[in-house]
Amino acid sequence: MARRGAGRLKREEYEDRPERAEMTAERTTRPRRPETERSDRLRSEAAEAINRGEAGRRSERSPRALERIPLPDSPLRLPDADVLFRRAFGDRAGGRALGRLEEAARAFSDERFQDARRILNQLVERTSVVPEVLELLGLVHYRMGHWRAGAKRLEAFRELTGSTEQHPVLADCYRAQRRFDDVAALWVELRDASPSAPLVTEGRIVAAGAIADQGRLAEALQLLEKSWKIPSRPREHHLRRAYALADMYERSGAAPRARELFTWVRGHDGGFADVADRVRSLA
């Protein structure tokens, strides 16, 4: 988390794993649909990309963006989860609550989302001031395809912490609901805060996908191309952005440029999403 410390609940226990990077890169440049399967679904969705994403969808009016409290200049320095639980419930009950949060984190890591949601709903009913509970519950709903519920919890996380750390996921929840004005507003917040290159990259991909969903492929391509150059030492977020950009080139009819970028991604990670299939399809 972008706050001081993380208590005994370590982020790696429940972070969305490398799969989320693949899911974001191969999904967020195309119209969204609810998801319940795992890697097999990722491969099949990617294989359908050309048929599903070639034509931009007809532009439509998006609901007006929510009125949000402006973010502070930097994320708030909040106490860790164990401190907040003990303040709310006392030492003994607070310790038990922390144990339940850790249990939910393990369930999330194991992709037992129903179990994680059940535990977290019990916790959030008792207290709504523990950021880790709101954050993890929002991620659980996101992975279950519960876009409205996920957005609700991640909006609460944003307001409580002043953090943009989950803005890409929150924006993706709104994109799934075709609330494009909210996607745009969150992208501006994330871009201006610029917390890290990986987070900004993920937010950029979601924002570009939302623009493309409205049939504005040229604008989406422009957003993905802005300040892009091939890095000498690519990291995972560079591969995600290159994949998304290549996908957008293909959708825009620029097959040679798409093939060039897909080939570059494959050269650095042959198992990234369905990139090998994408290269073959453009050969």
Where are these regions (language model features)?
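TPR/TPR-like (Sel1-like) alpha-helical repeat modules
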Residues: 160-164, 192-193, 221-229, 250-273, ...
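Generic helix N-cap/helix-start motif at coil->alpha-helix transitions
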Residues: 58-64, 92-100, 126-134, 161-169, ...
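Alpha-helical segment of the N-proximal tetratricopeptide repeat
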Residues: 87-136, 142
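Solenoid-like repeat scaffolds
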Residues: 86-93, 121-128, 155-162, 189-197, ...
